[in-house]
């Protein structure tokens, strides 16, 4: 039996689009931090789409609850080879 493993080094990435949602709703990072009970630095990392190794689902749930949005509104999957335009 020939077992082989397929390794895909390029699988795309997840982009945090929290800034877009916040800007549309006219809410500041300070205001969102106060409403969610999260520290400003956490909100700011998501707002700036800063490199993070994992998304905290509790943080994401609080943000979506306060902004009355879906996770798909603040996270976008970008396939490999596609450039953001």
Language-model segments: residues:
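Short alpha-helical "recognition helix" segments of helix-turn-helix
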Residues: 32-33
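Residue-level detection of the helix-turn-helix DNA-binding "recognition helix"
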Residues: 23, 37, 48, 79
């Amino acid at each position: 039996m020939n077992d082989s493993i397929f390794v895909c080094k390029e699988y795309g990435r997840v982009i945090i689009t929290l800034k877009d949602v916040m800007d549309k709703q006219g809410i500041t990072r300070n205001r969102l931090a106060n409403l969610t009970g999260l520290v400003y630095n956490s909100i700011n990392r998501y707002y700036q789409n800063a490199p993070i190794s994992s998304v905290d689902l509790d943080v994401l749930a609080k943000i979506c609850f306060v902004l009355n949005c879906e996770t798909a509104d603040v996270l976008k999957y970008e396939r490999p080879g596609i450039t953001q335009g």
